[in-house]
């Protein structure tokens, strides 16, 4: 991942001049966005005993970002992600008979990102993005019967609930105006494999 970040930064540096002339229309310096992503990665450390495996209901990631454009091509910013999940343990997972426990897990992520706007036209924007940061997760266990079943519990130490977080988006598409646009992006990380959302650009001072 570190090599990927380095290569990405070098590409951004050398592409800034090449792509700057394409961005004579869309040049908001401050941008905010909110989105929803499917199948975000997780580093949740809950592992059951050898006989019991959970069924997982992945709600998806909800995230918000702020980006400050340093040039008409390169921007940096921060991203916050919230990822709730539900794990259900049964004696027979296939038929969902014999409930053992219900576990609600959630993670909070803060990442700093680099965004490269490859193409900017009046109504279309193409970009790539990479981010790194930290994730903090926690859980809430319900209906657990420890006298009947044994499940390995996560560590209660806060330091053990902190993990590395990342997001890599090779391609993202924004469609709309300079001020408001919808977006869809494909990648891997805390924002999900496929994400959709809304981007709003603050009007620059004259």
List the predicted regions and their residue ranges.
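Sec-dependent N-terminal signal peptides
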Residues: 4-14, 20
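Gram-negative (and chloroplast) outer-membrane scaffold detector with strong preference
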Residues: 38, 60-145
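Extracellular loop and loop/strand-boundary signature of outer-membrane beta-barrel proteins
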Residues: 48-52, 95-102, 154-159, 181-183
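Transmembrane beta-barrel strands of outer-membrane/channel proteins
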Residues: 32-40, 78-82, 128-134, 173, ...
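Predominantly the C-terminal beta-signal and adjacent terminal strand-loop region
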Residues: 83-87, 157-206
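Outer-membrane beta-barrel channels and translocator barrels
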Residues: 27, 39, 71-73, 119-123, ...
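Short glycine/proline- and aromatic-enriched beta-strand/turn motifs that initiate or cap beta-hairpins
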Residues: 20-68, 199, 203
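Residues that define the transmembrane beta-barrel architecture of outer-membrane proteins
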Residues: 28-30, 56-62, 104-110, 124, ...
């Amino acid at each position: 991942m570190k090599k990927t970040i380095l290569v990405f930064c070098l590409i951004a540096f050398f592409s800034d001049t090449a792509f700057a002339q394409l961005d004579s229309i869309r040049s908001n310096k401050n941008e905010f966005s909110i989105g929803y992503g499917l199948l975000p990665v997780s580093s949740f450390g809950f592992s059951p005993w050898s006989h019991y495996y959970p069924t997982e209901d992945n709600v998806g990631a909800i995230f918000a970002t702020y980006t400050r454009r340093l040039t008409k091509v390169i921007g940096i910013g921060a991203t916050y992600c919230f990822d709730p999940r539900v794990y259900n343990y049964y004696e027979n997972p296939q038929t969902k008979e014999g409930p053992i426990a219900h576990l609600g897990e959630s993670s909070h992520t803060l990442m700093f990102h680099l965004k490269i706007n490859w193409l900017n036209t009046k109504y279309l924007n193409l970009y790539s993005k990479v981010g790194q940061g930290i994730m903090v997760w926690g859980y809430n266990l319900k209906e657990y019967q420890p006298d009947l079943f044994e499940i390995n519990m996560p560590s209660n130490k806060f330091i053990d609930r902190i993990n590395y977080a990342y997001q890599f988006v090779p391609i993202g598409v924004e469609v709309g105006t300079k001020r408001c646009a919808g977006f869809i992006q494909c990648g891997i990380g805390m924002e999900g494999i496929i994400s959709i959302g809304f981007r709003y650009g603050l009007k620059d001072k004259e």
